[in-house]
Amino acid sequence: MEYTDKLFNEALLVSELAHRGQSYDEIFPYMKHINDVIEVLKRFDIKSNKMLIAAALHDIIEDCALSYNKVKRYFGHEIAEMVYCVTDELGRDRKEKKRKTLPKTASNPDAIILKLADRIANIEHGGKIDMYAKEYQEFKGALFLNTPHSAHGMWEHLDELLKIKEIV
């Protein structure tokens, strides 16, 4: 599948329609978060349409009524796999969900980059920094070794964000 600008724009539209009525951080339309994740990728010089399309769709299986198969049919296997790999598994609580999800994310280097962009956006713009700080060692331990070298700057940035949190 060719990841064109047109397909990226279609992914944004699908995401906007699918997330309609949802909010981010209880006050913003959900597309703010989607756009934040896209901007994080661009800031770290990750500008391929494949990654930007996956960013536009990264929460669509988890939070909306779109299935893996629908994502695959319209956006291709690679995009569907990335989105699936960052989609939380079922669990009794957040800790169990993450414990089940992180190995799946770690199996796909592009999904790791996508998850890093998601986490950076959540820490920079969301109100849940304490929760993410508590999870950070397990999160990094599960994903760091399989992270492409080109994305190590994203880990450095996360380290800095959480260091600042300790000061404040």
Predicted regions located by residue number:
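Active-site helical microenvironments for divalent-metal-assisted chemistry
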Residues: 1-168
